[in-house]
Amino acid sequence: MPKFYIKPMSDLNNSVKHNSYFEGKVQSLGLDTDKGIATVGVMKKGTYQFSTSTVETIIVVSGVMDIKLPEGVWNKYNEEEKFEVPANSKFDIVCDTDVAYICYYA
């Protein structure tokens, strides 16, 4: 028996979900964690608008995000800072540089 096992791609596709938005400028990998559904992702420099269906908690891993939540106020979030987006809402993101993030879904 080998000391390691490489999963077939069909198994990998069932365990990790790949998301791509805005012509590939925003991409994430999603999976179930002990904290619930989570994604780890990257955003190229740019301006984006997203919609939520559940509460989302976003943690900036690298870079800086300017965020406009439904209240209409812009806030800046740096590395290791987090913010929460309400369910069933839209929010705007401006990235002046490439950004990495983690998102937890309630």
Regions found by a protein language model. Name each.
Residues 1-35:
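A short, N-terminal "cap"/entry segment at the start of jelly-roll beta-barrel domains
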Residues 32-53, 82-87:
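Conserved short histidine dyad/triad with adjacent acidic residue
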Residues 53-66:
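Short, conserved beta-strand element in jelly-roll/cupin
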Residues 86-106:
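Ligand-binding loop in jelly-roll beta-barrel domains
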